[in-house]
Amino acid sequence: MFIVKPSFLSMSGLALILLLTGCQSVSKTTDKVGSWLGVKPSVPEVNAKGMVDLSQTTLNQLEQFNTNMPKNQWVYMKNKTQDVYILQNKSDDQSILSFRFNCQLSTQKPTFYLYNAKGEQILSAYDDKLGQIQFLLDNKNYLNPFNLYSSQKLETFKKELVTAKTIKIYHAGHLYRFENQHAELLNKPVSCQE
C-alpha cells in the first residue's frame, strides 16, 4: 500500500484508503456540515455483480464500508479517479484475502495478501521466511502456486479457481476459509503493488 497507516485503521482498511481522492479535508468539512443539517453520508454499497466504486468516498464512509463489507464473496473495489483497483474476499472470521492476478502493469507479478481479523498482514506471496503455505480449492491441495520458479503452477491454479466453491489456506497450524462467490471478478485488472 502507498500511504502511512493511521493507528486507528486496520491494514485491510488501509487498502481501501488507496481508493480515496486527495480531498480529505473537503470531505471532512462536508461531513461536519451535513451532520449539522441532519444529513448522513451514505456508505457505498456493493452491487449485485460484487463491484463498488469508492471514487467519491470519505474516510468515514470508507471505514464504515470496511466494517460492513460483504462476507464470503469477492468484492471488486475501484477508484477510477486514482486508477486503483483492489479485489478482496472477507471470511466469516473477518480474515481478508486479496488475490492480484491480472496486474494493470505488465512489469508486476501476480501476488496475494492475507490479513487477519485485526487487519494485520499475515501472509503474502514470495516471502520465503513464512514457511510452507498450502492453498486448497474444494479440498484439492495446490501447495503454494505463487512459486518463483514455476509460473505453470499459478496458471493451473487460476484456471481451477474460477470453478471452485471454497478456498482454504493452511499455514502454521491455522486454516483460513473463504467462499468463492463472484469468482468471475478474479479476471478483472487490479493494482498489484502493495
Tell me what each language-model feature is.
Residues L14-I17:
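Viral structural modules
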Residues Q24-E194:
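A generic "folded-domain core" signal
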Residues F2-S12:
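Bacterial N-terminal signal peptides that target proteins for export
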Residues L19-G22:
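C-terminal motif of bacterial Sec signal peptides marking the signal peptidase cleavage site
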